[in-house]
């Protein structure tokens, strides 16, 4: 663990807990905190405050206290949550308490031996340019001997239930938009040993959903995540205990949140009386359609946000409601940033394919709590009309076009793996792809060089995005293939998207098979 240092990147820091500069410990987190303290003290003339939250991971509480030691030692006022809290609540507290910076200690859905350090700025969103690079420079200039751990207790304020109460109130007021009989809707919920174990039931109950069944074995916070292989609600295995309970109680919906409760997974009862897992794109389609359908007097002063690798169907939904649609790079921080970048417009909602969704701007990051409430709102309204969420999704396909996506991740471990990922990206960058499953290529976007090349007339346009290692191929029929290396794991990710018209519910199975075959053909073209 001494051969290289654990580095602080644009998304913060994530690594294995242990001794040494290549591990998560009080010194590596202390170095981050000293650098951020230096930046705050240099760039602000008034006394600033920070807020610190942490999830259920092993050693999170001790590490959070050590982070508080360093901030307070540097004369910065600290608000520290007294126990584990969801990441969206940290974003909320940052805005509410008018802090300059927020820190959450979490490693999302990584294995139990990991922990991480995520940084939020005064708007409530994750750090973005130019602040991210400035913080990295400050942190890199800190030596371990520069870190001051001398806690100033008079500057450390523990936060107990007040922020919870306000967050619950605001989540309900923003998410409770349906008109159904909520007490008839049967919900199974698992926090997968994470931070939503108390707050999500309180939000659902407060909104009127009283028929709630919690997976008891997974309702206790546990940094070892003993009942699952991975605490990731994208993985069917993580929801298997919840689905078993759903079968036993005949539930309408299954909700699972990841350890820091920013991402949510859903399984819903279909027409065969089985539970279907929704992917992140499908969830985003359902929530966006429902939220927009409940709003009156929409126009282009309102906008919704998404990312370059998420379903293009969202754009069709936005256009049909006459609201503006904005797209950012992969990562939810770019959706949060839109709210700052377009102050004259009103943000309604936004989402990405990786199971993250945000409703309103009262938080500035993905929020599993409010998203789960809206999912129950649309689900219970469907139930009162005698349909289920799969029917609702198919209705969306009929209205806006049937879009189907598939993500394939290829793992390449170690130093050799990094080289291989780089080589795959370069091959794709220089490839002379002419078509996608027989449909003529019309556009190639390279976000690393910020260029889009029109494949019909050879025209080159500049892309108005920060540079990022993402490639997107698009053909005449709207088929797209995107490729990018993962920011947090040794993987390269391929996103396939195909679409066609769906005329009726009866046609769904047949057309679904056509799109599945199309995806199989594409994966073969890209050597899978």
Question: Predicted regions: what is each one?
Answer:
Residues 2-22, 107-108, 191-203, 259, ...:
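Conserved phosphate/anionic-ligand binding catalytic regions in large, soluble enzymes, centered on
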Residues 61-66, 91-95, 113-119, 148, ...:
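Short acidic, glycine/serine/threonine-rich loops at helix termini
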Residues 2, 6, 115-240, 245-246:
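Gly/Ser/Thr-enriched, mixed-charge loops and adjacent short helices
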Residues 1-67, 74, 157-184, 195:
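An N-terminal, well-structured beta->alpha segment
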Residues 51-114, 210-265:
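N-terminal small/polar loop signature for handling phosphorylated ligands or for N-terminal nucleophile
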């Amino acid at each position: 663990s001494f051969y290289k240092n654990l580095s602080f990147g644009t998304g913060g820091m994530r690594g294995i807990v242990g001794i040494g500069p290549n591990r998560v410990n009080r010194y590596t987190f202390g170095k981050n905190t000293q650098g951020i303290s230096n930046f705050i003290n240099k760039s602000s003339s008034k006394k600033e405050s920070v807020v610190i939250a942490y999830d259920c991971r092993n050693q999170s509480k001790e590490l959070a206290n050590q982070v508080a030691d360093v901030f307070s030692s540097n004369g910065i006022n600290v608000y520290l949550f007294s126990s584990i809290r969801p990441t969206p609540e940290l974003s909320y507290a940052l805005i509410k308490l008018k802090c300059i910076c927020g820190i959450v200690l979490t490693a999302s859905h990584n294995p139990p031996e990991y922990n991480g350090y995520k940084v939020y700025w005064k708007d409530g969103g994750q750090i973005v340019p130019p602040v991210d690079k400035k913080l990295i420079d400050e942190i890199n200039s800190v030596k371990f001997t520069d870190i001051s751990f001398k806690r100033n207790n008079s500057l450390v304020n523990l936060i107990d239930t007040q922020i919870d109460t306000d967050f619950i109130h605001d989540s309900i007021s923003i998410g409770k938009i349906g008109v159904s009989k909520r007490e008839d809707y049967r919900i199974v919920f698992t926090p997968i040993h994470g931070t939503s174990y108390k707050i999500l039931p309180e939000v659902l109950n407060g909104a009127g959903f009283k028929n709630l069944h919690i997976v008891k074995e997974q309702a206790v916070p546990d940094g070892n995540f003993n009942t699952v292989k991975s605490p990731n609600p994208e993985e069917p295995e993580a929801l298997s205990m919840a689905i078993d309970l759903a079968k036993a109680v005949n539930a309408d919906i299954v909700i699972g949140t990841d350890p820091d409760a920013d991402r949510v997974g859903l399984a819903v009862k279909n027409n065969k009386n089985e539970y279907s897992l929704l992917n992140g794109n499908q969830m985003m389609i359902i929530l966006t359609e429902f939220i927009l359908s409940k709003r009156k007097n929409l126009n282009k002063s309102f906008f919704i946000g998404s990312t370059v690798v998420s379903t293009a169907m969202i754009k069709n939904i936005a256009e049909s409601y006459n609201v503006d649609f904005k797209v950012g790079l992969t990562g939810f921080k770019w959706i949060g940033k839109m709210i700052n970048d377009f102050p004259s417009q009103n943000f309604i909602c936004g989402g990405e394919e990786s199971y993250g969704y945000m409703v309103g701007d009262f938080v500035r990051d993905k929020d599993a709590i409010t998203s789960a409430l809206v999912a129950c709102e649309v689900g219970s309204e469907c139930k009162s009309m005698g349909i289920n969420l799969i029917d609702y999704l198919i209705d969306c396909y009929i209205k806006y076009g049937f879009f189907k996506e598939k993500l394939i991740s290829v793992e390449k471990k170690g130093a050799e793996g990094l080289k291989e990922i780089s080589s795959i990206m370069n091959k794709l960058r220089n490839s002379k792809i002419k078509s996608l499953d027989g449909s003529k290529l019309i556009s190639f976007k390279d976000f690393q060089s910020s260029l889009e090349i029109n494949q019909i007339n050879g025209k080159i346009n500049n892309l108005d995005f920060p540079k990022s290692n993402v490639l997107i191929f698009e053909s005449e029929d709207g088929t797209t293939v995107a490729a990018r290396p993962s920011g947090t794991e040794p993987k390269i990710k391929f996103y396939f998207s195909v679409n066609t018209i769906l005329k009726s519910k009866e046609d769904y199975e047949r057309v679904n098979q056509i799109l599945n075959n199309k995806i199989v053909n594409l994966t073969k073209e890209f050597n899978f």
